[in-house]
């Protein structure tokens, strides 16, 4: 076992890794904390394999691209170029969402990491995030953030929205900067991280498996919004690939 320590991002207390555990509880503030991968025993890293790393140098993974007009966004232009997956949209109807997912990767347990930047639009007028355990366009989870430093986890079931985690504020979000979202799913346990900091954890059994992707949401009719997705990494337990 490693003797190295690291610090709790919530309270700053020193923490000691525990074997190959990916997540431990801080004994001082009781926050769930992800253990840096390099401090875990090798057996933990050996349990995972990278299914996909996409830095958007090309569209080899067949993401949704092109110009689209709908009652929700008009227009919506999605382009992969110069190492980014850019979404430019004019919101036609308030509280509209647009999604794109990878149908080739259906997983149950997984570790999903995505980096993105909000380029244009008001801080609270739109959000971006990751979708996971997607069944179809009416059934999936959505972990998303705003540049006003709020995040939420939503789930749509047959088109009806529920909020397992309602909007919460967190200083983990960097306004006007690149932000990283992570989801670690093991069975019904779902852990959510922003820029390496665990912001919430739930047990939820709406969907046990599905595909993964990204999404944007616009809340203000008439507003133009732009988001750049910079990379997309999906890992799964060995043997599940």
Which residues does each PLM region occupy?
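Flexible glycan-contacting loops in extracellular carbohydrate-active proteins
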Residues: 202-231
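Short carbohydrate-recognition loop motifs
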Residues: 74-96
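Secretory/extracellular carbohydrate-interaction modules
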Residues: 90-156
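Short Cys/His-rich micro-motifs in 6-15 aa windows
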Residues: 30-40
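Extracellular carbohydrate-recognition regions
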Residues: 44-69, 230, 241
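Short cysteine-rich clusters marking metal-coordination/redox-active sites
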Residues: 8-11, 26-29
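Short, aromatic/His-centered strand-loop micro-motif at the edge of beta-sheets
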Residues: 159-180
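Short tryptophan-centered beta-strand motifs in secreted/extracellular beta-sheet-rich domains
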Residues: 56, 112-114, 176-186, 190-192
């Amino acid at each position: 076992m490693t003797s190295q320590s690291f610090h709790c991002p919530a309270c700053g207390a020193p923490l000691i890794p525990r074997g190959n555990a990916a997540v431990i509880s801080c004994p001082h503030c009781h926050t769930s904390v992800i253990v840096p991968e390099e401090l875990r025993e090798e057996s933990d890293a050996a349990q995972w394999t990278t299914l996909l790393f996409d830095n958007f140098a090309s569209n080899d993974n067949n993401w949704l691209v092109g110009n689209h007009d709908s009652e929700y966004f008009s227009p919506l232009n999605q382009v992969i170029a110069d190492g980014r997956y850019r979404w430019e949209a004019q919101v036609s109807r308030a509280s509209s969402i647009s999604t794109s997912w990878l149908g080739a990767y259906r997983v149950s347990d997984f570790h999903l990491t995505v980096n993105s930047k909000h380029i244009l639009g008001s801080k609270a007028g739109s959000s971006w995030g990751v979708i996971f355990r997607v069944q179809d366009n009416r059934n999936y989870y959505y972990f998303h953030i705003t540049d006003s430093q709020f995040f939420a986890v939503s789930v749509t079931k047959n088109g009806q929205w529920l909020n397992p985690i309602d909007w919460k504020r967190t200083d983990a979000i960097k306004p006007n900067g690149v932000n990283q979202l992570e989801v670690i799913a093991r069975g019904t346990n779902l852990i959510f991280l922003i820029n390496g900091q665990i912001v919430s954890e739930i047990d939820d059994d709406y969907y046990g498996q599905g595909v993964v992707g990204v999404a944007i949401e616009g809340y203000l009719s008439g507003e133009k919004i732009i988001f750049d997705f910079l990379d997309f990494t999906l890992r799964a337990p060995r043997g599940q690939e």
